Amino acid sequence: MKLHIVAVGHKMPGWIASGFDEYAKRMPPELRIELREVKPELRSGSRTADSVMAAEQQRIEAALPKNARVVALDERGRDWTTMQLAQALPAWQQDGRDVAFVIGGADGLAPALKSRAELLLRVSSLTLPHGMVRVLLAEQLYRAWSITQNHPYHRA
């Protein structure tokens, strides 16, 4: 099973790429993390947020792996603890499908895309830069895996 992070945005600062890469390389081969960047839609005064999200939705859907479990990151999503994520990983592995975590653009995700998701997940109640969410998610996936393996990285 692969873990995909499909994120609107490109040209992230070097520290974002370094942070993401650090946690991605720690993952075992059977849970490899792959980042798929989606070009953000250009915003102008005449464009509505809905039209921007609709255009980004098409790009996101084109980047989603076929038959993947879609987990949309959304501020109104469910609050999960790291332990809940750690409990979900083995179940998802047994299911056999890849998991795609979707990070929207500045306006969020289109309602139709959120409806398609099997899970809406909130990463934080804080407002975070979208690039930082990539790093945070990669770290939490690594931490969740480390919990399932009794690895010393997680000492809770």
Curated annotation (Swiss-Prot):
Stretches that traverse the bilayer: none
Keyword rRNA processing: yes
Root EC class: transferase
Localization annotation: Cytoplasm
Binding residue positions for S-adenosyl-L-methionine: 73, 104, 123-128
Superkingdom of origin organism: Bacteria
Catalytic activity: pseudouridine(1915) in 23S rRNA + S-adenosyl-L-methionine = N(3)-methylpseudouridine(1915) in 23S rRNA + S-adenosyl-L-homocysteine + H(+)
Gene Ontology MF: a single term: rRNA (pseudouridine-N3-)-methyltransferase activity
Alphabetical UniProt keywords: Cytoplasm, Methyltransferase, rRNA processing, S-adenosyl-L-methionine, Transferase
GO CC term (a single one): cytoplasm
NCBIfam families for the chain: PRK00103.1-4 (NF000986), tRNA_RlmH_YbeA (TIGR00246)
PANTHER family assigned: METHYLTRANSFERASE (PTHR33603), RIBOSOMAL RNA LARGE SUBUNIT METHYLTRANSFERASE H (PTHR33603:SF1)
Family the UniProt entry places it in: Belongs to the RNA methyltransferase RlmH family.
Protein name in the entry: Ribosomal RNA large subunit methyltransferase H
Organism: Burkholderia mallei (strain ATCC 23344)
